[in-house]
Design a protein with these regions (language model features):
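Aromatic-lined carbohydrate-binding surfaces of glycoside hydrolases
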Residues: 1-153, 183-185
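Short, acidic/polar
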Residues: 69-72, 163-167, 196-206
């Protein structure tokens, strides 16, 4: 219904779902805790710190890939857009738990690239163009070349004074980018509009 509502108003509603990090609540459950990079995730007390820092899939477990593919299949069918945002942001604990042995061998960023490529392959098999958040790839912008050529990198910076360094370096390495400002409305009741306006203005100028 929401997709239909948007389409009637010439708005493209793009599906967006976590496929790597930001799965804290899922990975604390009895059903899925074994898919967490962090061991002993099940049954721990809820923590706002843990919610933001320890929420990444264990890509060594093939069940994690099957889980993500199932999520994508179920979700993508609800949208007419040919775009699909796989997120893949803030994977802070990648290679620090169950995947440490592989990280010691090839590095956590190589693990990141491997996983994003696998997820993109599945998204593309459904006729969708993948998008992902660019905070992790920005640390090694040259590795954007190792991802699908048509992937869209969503470069974000929500601060009062965003810089253009990541934007420029990713552009120099051939990235297709959407620049994403923020409206300063998280963890509070009222948006910080002065900061939001300044952030949007600067990010738009970089674009």
């Amino acid at each position: 219904e929401f997709d239909e509502y948007c389409a009637e108003r010439n708005i493209e509603l793009v599906p967006s779902i976590a496929t790597f990090g930001h799965l804290y609540k899922v990975l604390r459950t009895k059903t899925f805790h074994e898919l967490s990079e962090v061991e002993e995730a099940e049954g721990t007390a809820f923590s706002f710190y843990e919610r933001m820092c320890h929420h990444t899939l264990n890509i060594m477990d093939e069940r994690a890939y099957e889980f993500v593919c199932r999520l994508i299949d179920e979700y993508s069918s609800l949208f007419r857009s040919n775009l699909f945002n796989i997120n893949c942001d803030e994977t802070f604990d990648l290679g620090k738990g169950r995947g440490k042995k592989l990280a010691d061998q090839i590095g956590s960023h190589a693990m990141y690239i491997q996983w994003v490529n696998r997820v993109c392959e599945h998204v593309k098999s459904l006729g969708k163009r993948p998008m992902f958040w660019g905070d992790i790839i920005a640390a090694h912008p040259e590795t954007i070349r190792e991802l699908p050529e048509d992937i869209i990198c969503m470069t974000w910076d929500y601060s009062l004074a965003p810089g253009d360094t990541n934007v420029r370096k990713l552009w120099e390495n051939g990235a297709h980018q959407y620049l994403c400002p923020g409206v300063q409305g998280w963890n509070q009741t009222i948006h910080l509009l002065d900061i939001a306006y300044e952030n949007i203005k600067k990010m738009a100028s970089f674009a």
